From Swiss-Prot:
Any matching Pfam family: GlnD_UR_UTase
Keyword Nucleotide-binding attributed: yes
Start and end residues of each stretch annotated as Adenylyl transferase: 468-970
Record's catalysed reaction(s): [glutamine synthetase]-O(4)-(5'-adenylyl)-L-tyrosine + phosphate = [glutamine synthetase]-L-tyrosine + ADP; [glutamine synthetase]-L-tyrosine + ATP = [glutamine synthetase]-O(4)-(5'-adenylyl)-L-tyrosine + diphosphate
Cofactor names: Mg(2+)
A cellular component annotation (GO) from this entry: cytosol
Domain of life: Bacteria
Protein name in UniProt: Bifunctional glutamine synthetase adenylyltransferase/adenylyl-removing enzyme
Lineage: Bacteria, Pseudomonadati, Pseudomonadota, Gammaproteobacteria, Chromatiales
Keyword Cell inner membrane tagged: no
Region spans: Adenylyl removase: 1-454
Gene that encodes the chain: glnE
Organism (species): Thioalkalivibrio sulfidiphilus (strain HL-EbGR7)
Annotated EC: 2.7.7.89, 2.7.7.42
Length: 970
C-alpha cells in the first residue's frame, strides 16, 4: 500500500460537515491504494473544495490519476492560457480511432475539466468570469471539434456537401442562451440550433442531399455529446429553441430559417436570439446569417411592445414556479437571475435596433452600457450586477455539489450548510440574509422597469375609479349616445357630441378594423387612458381631435400604442404638447418615431448646443454602414426631426427666448449640411477619385463650400424655413480632373456634388424630408451653373450682380465645407459690399425692389397684417438694414462684421449711422414680429394677424421707411 501524507486539518469546516469529509478521505485513500497512486502532499484547498462539491470528490475517488495530473500540471493553481482549452479538446479528438473511443475520451476530458473548474471556483482561485468563460470554452470546443470529426466521417462515405455552384457546405451551429452569451453555468445543458447555408447534394458515390447530410451530422453530434454512458455525458443538448421546436426539422438551410423568423417568429424567439452566437462549424457563413437575422431581433424602430411580451413571459414563469413551488429558485423565482436578464434584454429589444451599442450578448456588458448611455442610473446597475454575480455564484455552487442541473435552494440542513460555507458564510442564516437582500433589490428594480401598464396597474391595485371604467365603456361602445355624451360633458369636453363622433369614427374606421388581435388589445388599453388625459387638458376638445388623428396614424404600428400605454410620462407630455401646438402634434403624427423623445422631459426640453448636436449626429451616423446611403438619409432626417421637436417643445414651454430658438434651428441645419456634404463627398471620391489641378505649376486639391443666404445666413431660421444656399469650389489652373479610374473634369465633379447634396436634402423618403432647398441666389439665378468657381463668383459679384443680389449678400456666410473657400468668400463679400455707392441711386433701387415685392406678395385685406411682407413689417426693416450696409460700409467697415439684422443694427449705432433710439425700436419690433411668426408657425397659422395688433409699431416702421428711403434722411 502506497503511503500518503498526513491528512489535512478539518478545522476550517463547520462541525456538521466533517463526518462526510472523513468518509470521502477514507474512500480516496483506498482508491489511491487500489491504483498505486502516491501523493507527496494534500492540496491545500482540498477540504474546502470537497466540502462544497461531492461531485469533484467522487471523480477524484473514481480516478485519482485525474487529480494527480491536475496537481502536476499546475492548472489547479493557475488559469488556462489562451488556446489551452482548445488544444486539450483537439488532442482528444485527434487521437480518437472511432466513435466509441471519442465518446469515452470526451467524457473523461469533461470529468477532468469540470473537476478543475469546480476546484478553482470553490477554492477562491477563480472569479465568476473565469468560471463562466472556462465552462463556455469547454462546451464550445467540444461542439466544434466533435462536429468537424463527424463531418469528416460522413464525407468519407457520402462525399462533400456542395451548393448549386459547387461551393462546399458546412454545418453552422448557433449557441443560444448562456452558451451564446459566454455565461454557461456549471451543469447547464447547451441550447443549439443547427443550420447550413444552401441546398444541394454531396459529391460522393453515395450522394445525399444536403438536408439529409446535415440531419445525420446533427443526430450523430447530439449522440456524441448527450448520450449517457458509463463515463457520463459531455453536455446535455437541448434543440427545442429551433424553429417549430420539437416538431420542426433538426436542421434548416439559411433561406428556410430566415423565412421562418420573418413569417412565424414570436417575441420569445427574438428574446432567445439576442444571445445567439456561432459556436461551431462555418463561422463566416454563420456571421452572415446573424447579420441577416438582426432586423428580426433588433427592430429599427423603438419596440415598446417588448415590455408587454417580456412581462407576459415572466408572468408565465411565475405561474409555473408557483405551480412547482419554486419560490426558492434562484434562476426563475422572484428577484432571481432571469429578472436581471429581462431588465437588460428589454432595453435591447426596444432600443438596440436604433442603437447598435446595445447589441451585446452578455448581460453584465449590457447593464454597464445602459449606465453609460444614462438609460439606467449607475447605482441601479451596480446593484443589479452585484446581485447577478452573487446569484450566478450561488447557482454554480448548487450545481457543483452533485453536478445536477438545479437552481433550487436545498432543503436539508446539511446541504444548506454546504452551500452557505461555499459562499463564505458560517451558517445558513447569514447566507440567507445576503441572498434575500440581493433578491429584494432585483425584484424592486424589475418591478420598476416592468410596471404594469397604467390601466392594468390601477386595476391591480384596486384603484380604478368609475371614471376610468366609464371611459373604457365609451371606447368599447357599451353606452348609448346620450349617456356617453353626458359622461364626456361631465369629463370636461365642451362639444360632447363631436367628441363622441371622433371616438366612434376612430373605433369603426378602417385603421382599427384591420388591427391584429395584439394591436386591438393595446389600443383598447390606450384609449381610456388617452380620453382621461385629454379631459384634463386646458382645451380637451382640441387635444382630443389631435390625439385621435395621431392614434389613427399609428394604430397599425402597435409598438407606438405600447409606448403610450407603458409610459405615463410619454402620454402626459404628448397631451401637453398637443394642447400647446398643432404643429408639434402634426410633427409627431407624421413621424411617430419621435414619441420616444417624450419619455424623458429632462432631454425633451433641453435642446443641444452646436457642439452637442455635432457629436450626437456623428454618433448616430457611426452606427450605419458607410455604404448604406439610404439608411444614412433616414438617420439624418430622424436626427433633424428629434432636434427640432426639442427646440419646439422648449420654445412652446417658454424655456428658450426667440434668439435662442433661431440659433438652435440654425445650428441643426449647419450640422446637417456639414454631414451631408461629407457623406456625398466621400461617395463621389470613391467613384471618381479626388479633384486635382495645377495652379502656377503646383499641385492643388480644390475644395467645396456651402454658402448660406437669407435666414440661414442671418442665423434666423424658423420652423418651416427653407435653405437658401449657394455652392462654390476653388478649382483653377490646369489639369482640372479627378484622380480616380473614372476621371471627371472638376467642374463636372462639383456639379454632381451639388446636385447630390440638393437630392439628399430635398428628397422625400419614408422618414420625410430634411429641407426644401433654394439655390436661385447663385450667380445668374436659375439659369446659371449650380456650382460656381470662387473666381467666377467674384467676377459676377463685381461686374454683373444686381443691387438686390448685393442686398442678399449682406445676409450670406459660409456654413459648411472648405475653410480656404470660406476665407475667400468672406474677403469677396467685404470687398463687394464695401464699394462706395451713389446713395440716391441705391435708395431708389432698393425702394423699387421693395415695391415690387409688395405688389406681388403683400396682403390685399386692410383688416389683416402680413408680418413678413406688408408695409411696416419685417421686409421693411430688412430692406432698410441692407440699404444702410450698402450705403455706409464704404466708410464704416464694421457694418460687414455680421450677417444678421440684430447685430448689424448694433453696429449701425456704434458707427453713428443710426440713432440709438431708432435702432432699439427696430430691434425690439423685429424680435416681436419674429416671435409672433414662431408662435403662429407652431399653431400652423400663416404669418398674418389682425391689422390692429401691431398698429403702432407698424406705423413707426413706415415713418422710418419714409424718412430714410423716400426723404433720404438717416
Amino acid at each position: 500500500m502506497n503511503s500518503l501524507p498526513p491528512r489535512p486539518s478539518l478545522d476550517v469546516l463547520p462541525e456538521a460537515l466533517r463526518p462526510d469529509l472523513i468518509r470521502l478521505l477514507d474512500d480516496f485513500e483506498s482508491a489511491c491504494a487500489r491504483d498505486g497512486i502516491a501523493l507527496d502532499h494534500w492540496p491545500e484547498a482540498l477540504v474546502r473544495v470537497w466540502a462544497g462539491s461531492g461531485f469533484a470528490a467522487r471523480i477524484a475517488i473514481r480516478r485519482p490519476n485525474l487529480l494527480l495530473e491536475l496537481i502536476q500540471d499546475g492548472t489547479l493553481a493557475r488559469p488556462l492560457e489562451a488556446g489551452e482549452m482548445a488544444a486539450r479538446v483537439s488532442a482528444v479528438v485527434q487521437a480518437a480511432q472511432d466513435e466509441a473511443a471519442l465518446m469515452r475520451d470526451l467524457r473523461l476530458l469533461r470529468q477532468r475539466e469540470m473537476m478543475r473548474i469546480a476546484w478553482r471556483d470553490l477554492s477562491g482561485e477563480a472569479g465568476l468570469d473565469e468560471t463562466l468563460g472556462d465552462l463556455t470554452d469547454l462546451a464550445e470546443h467540444c461542439i466544434d471539434q466533435a462536429a468537424a470529426w463527424v463531418h469528416g466521417q460522413l464525407v468519407q462515405r457520402h462525399g462533400e456537401p456542395r451548393d448549386a455552384e459547387g461551393r462546399p457546405q458546412r454545418l453552422v451551429v448557433l449557441g443560444m442562451g448562456k452558451l451564446g452569451g459566454r455565461e454557461l453555468n456549471f451543469s447547464s445543458d447547451v441550447d443549439l440550433i443547427f443550420t447550413y447555408a444552401a441546398r444541394g447534394e454531396t459529391d460522393g458515390e453515395k450522394p445525399l442531399d444536403n438536408q439529409q447530410f446535415f440531419i445525420r451530422l446533427g443526430q450523430r453530434l447530439i449522440r456524441l455529446l448527450d448520450e449517457n454512458t458509463a463515463e457520463g455525458f459531455v453536455f446535455r443538448v437541448d434543440m427545442r429553441l429551433r424553429p417549430f421546436g420539437d416538431a420542426g426539422p433538426l436542421v434548416m438551410d439559411f433561406d428556410t430559417l430566415e423565412g421562418y423568423y420573418e413569417s412565424h417568429g414570436r417575441e420569445w424567439e427574438r428574446y432567445a436570439l439576442i444571445k445567439a452566437r456561432v459556436v461551431a462549424g462555418d463561422r463566416e457563413a454563420g456571421r452572415e446569417l446573424m447579420r441577416a437575422l438582426r432586423p428580426f431581433v433588433f427592430r429599427r424602430y423603438l419596440d415598446y411592445g417588448a415590455f408587454a411580451a417580456l412581462r407576459d413571459m415572466k408572468a408565465m414563469i411565475n405561474r409555473e414556479a408557483a405551480r412547482r413551488s419554486r419560490g426558492d429558485d434562484v434562476k426563475l423565482g422572484e428577484g432571481g437571475i432571469r429578472e436581471v436578464e429581462f431588465i437588460g434584454q428589454a432595453f435591447q429589444l426596444i432600443r438596440a435596433g436604433r442603437d447598435p451599442r446595445l447589441q451585446l450578448r452578455g448581460i453584465r456588458p449590457v447593464l454597464r452600457r445602459l449606465a453609460e448611455m444614462e438609460l439606467m442610473p449607475g447605482y441601479v446597475v451596480d446593484q443589479l450586477i452585484t446581485a447577478y454575480e452573487f446569484l450566478r455564484r450561488t447557482e454554480n455552487h448548487l450545481q457543483m455539489a452533485q453536478d445536477q442541473q438545479t437552481h433550487r435552494l436545498p432543503e436539508s440542513d446539511e446541504a444548506r450548510l454546504r452551500l452557505a460555507f461555499s459562499m463564505g458564510h458560517d451558517d445558513w442564516e447569514g447566507f440567507s440574509r445576503e441572498l434575500a437582500r440581493h433578491r429584494r433589490r432585483v425584484q424592486e428594480h424589475f418591478q420598476q422597469v416592468f410596471a404594469a401598464p397604467q390601466g392594468e396597474a390601477e386595476e391591480a391595485a384596486g384603484a380604478e375609479g368609475p371614471g376610468q371604467a366609464v371611459l373604457a365603456s365609451i371606447w368599447a361602445g357599451d353606452r348609448s349616445g346620450e349617456r356617453a355624451q353626458a359622461v364626456l360633458a361631465e369629463a370636461g369636453f365642451r362639444d360632447a357630441p363631436k367628441a363622441l363622433e371622433w371616438i366612434e369614427d376612430l373605433r369603426e374606421g378602417a385603421a382599427c378594423r384591420s388591427l391584429t388581435a395584439t394591436g386591438r388589445e393595446r389600443l383598447d388599453q390606450l384609449m381610456p387612458l388617452l380620453l382621461g388625459a385629454a379631459a384634463g387638458a386646458e382645451d380637451p376638445d382640441t387635444v382630443l381631435s389631435r390625439l385621435v388623428t395621431l392614434v389613427r396614424s399609428i394604430a397599425r404600428r402597435s409598438v407606438y400604442l405600447s409606448l403610450l400605454v407603458e409610459s405615463p410620462m410619454a402620454l402626459s407630455q404628448l397631451v401637453k404638447l398637443c394642447d400647446a401646438s398643432p404643429w408639434i402634434a402634426q410633427l409627431l403624427t407624421r413621424h411617430p418615431l419621435l414619441l420616444d423623445e417624450l419619455l424623458d422631459p429632462r432631454s425633451l426640453y433641453a435642446p443641444m448646443d452646436r457642439e452637442g448636436l455635432s457629436a450626437e449626429l456623428d454618433e448616430e451616423l457611426s452606427q450605419v454602414p458607410e455604404d448604406d446611403m439610404e439608411q444614412m438619409m433616414d438617420r439624418l432626417r430622424q436626427f433633424q426631426q428629434v432636434q427640432m421637436l426639442k427646440v419646439a417643445a422648449a420654445d412652446i414651454m417658454g424655456v428658450l427666448p426667440l434668439m435662442k430658438v433661431s440659433d438652435h434651428l440654425t445650428w441643426i441645419a449647419e450640422v446637417v449640411l456639414e454631414r451631408v456634404l461629407s457623406l456625398v463627398m466621400a461617395q463621389l471620391h470613391a467613384r471618381y477619385g479626388r479633384p486635382r489641378c495645377l495652379i502656377d505649376g503646383r499641385p492643388y486639391e480644390p475644395g467645396f463650400a456651402i454658402i448660406g443666404y437669407g435666414k440661414l445666413g442671418g442665423l434666423e431660421l424658423g420652423y418651416g424655413s427653407d435653405l437658401d444656399i449657394v455652392f462654390l469650389h476653388d478649382s483653377a489652373g490646369e489639369q482640372q480632373m479627378t484622380d480616380g479610374d473614372k476621371a471627371l473634369d472638376n467642374s463636372e465633379f462639383f456639379a454632381r456634388l451639388g446636385q447630390r447634396i440638393v437630392h439628399v436634402l430635398g428628397t422625400y423618403t419614408g422618414a420625410g424630408r430634411l429641407y426644401e432647398v433654394d439655390t436661385r441666389l447663385r450667380p445668374s439665378g436659375a439659369s446659371g451653373l449650380l456650382v460656381s468657381s470662387l473666381k467666377a463668383f467674384e467676377l459676377y459679384q463685381e461686374t454683373k450682380a444686381w443691387t438686390w443680389e448685393h442686398q442678399a449678400l449682406v445676409r450670406a456666410r459660409p456654413v459648411a465645407g472648405d475653410a480656404h473657400i470660406a476665407e475667400g468668400f468672406a474677403e469677396i463679400r467685404r470687398r463687394v459690399l464695401g464699394i462706395c455707392r451713389d446713395r440716391e441711386k441705391l435708395r431708389q433701387e432698393v425702394r423699387e425692389m421693395r415695391e415690387k415685392m409688395w405688389s406681388e406678395h403683400a396682403s390685399r385685406d386692410p383688416s389683416r397684417f402680413n408680418l413678413k411682407r406688408d408695409p411696416g413689417g419685417i421686409a421693411d426693416i430688412e430692406f432698410m438694414v441692407q440699404y444702410w450696409v450698402l450705403a455706409y460700409a464704404c466708410d464704416h467697415p464694421p457694418l460687414l462684421d455680421y450677417p444678421d439684422n440684430i447685430r448689424i443694427l448694433e453696429r449701425l449705432v456704434v458707427t453713428g449711422v443710426l440713432p440709438e433710439e431708432d435702432a432699439r425700436f427696430l430691434t425690439d419690433t423685429y424680435r416681436e414680429f419674429r416671435n409672433r411668426i414662431h408662435r403662429l408657425t407652431l399653431q400652423e397659422s400663416d404669418a398674418v394677424v389682425d391689422a390692429a395688433e401691431f398698429a403702432e409699431q407698424r406705423e413707426t416702421v413706415r415713418a422710418l421707411w419714409r424718412r430714410v428711403m423716400e426723404e433720404g434722411k438717416a
